[in-house]
């Protein structure tokens, strides 16, 4: 009886973790949120574009915070 329950649990877990090959991965909107930073105005990429500045460093090997300067707050003081 116990082995039957364990086998059933393994089958159910296997089916829960199965991802169909045609449409695997997170949806486009979720990818956009997780690949962005600075209140969704910046992006994480290996190098910033010419008109962007680095606001902070994030994930290793990626610069997280490539933001257009018009979205950055005005700095006060030195």
Curated annotation (Swiss-Prot):
Its main location: secreted. Keywords: Antibiotic, Antimicrobial, Defensin, Disulfide bond, Secreted, Signal. Disulfide bonds join 37-64, 48-66. The keyword Manganese does not apply. It is found in: Secreted. InterPro entries: Beta-defensin, Beta_defensin_dom. Residues 1-24 form the signal peptide. Pfam families: Defensin_beta_2 (PF13841). One of its GO terms (biological process) is innate immune response. Has antibacterial activity. Belongs to the beta-defensin family. PANTHER family: BETA-DEFENSIN 123-RELATED (PTHR15001), BETA-DEFENSIN 135 (PTHR15001:SF10). This is Beta-defensin 135. It comes from Pan troglodytes (Chimpanzee). The gene is DEFB135.
């Amino acid at each position: 009886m116990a082995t039957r329950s364990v086998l059933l649990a393994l089958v159910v877990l296997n089916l829960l973790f199965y991802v169909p090959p045609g449409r695997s991965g997170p949806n486009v909107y979720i990818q956009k949120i997780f690949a962005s930073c600075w209140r969704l105005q910046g992006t994480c990429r290996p190098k910033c574009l010419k008109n962007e500045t680095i606001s902070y460093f994030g994930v290793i090997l990626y610069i997280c915070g490539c933001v257009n300067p018009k979205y950055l707050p005005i700095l006060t003081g030195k």
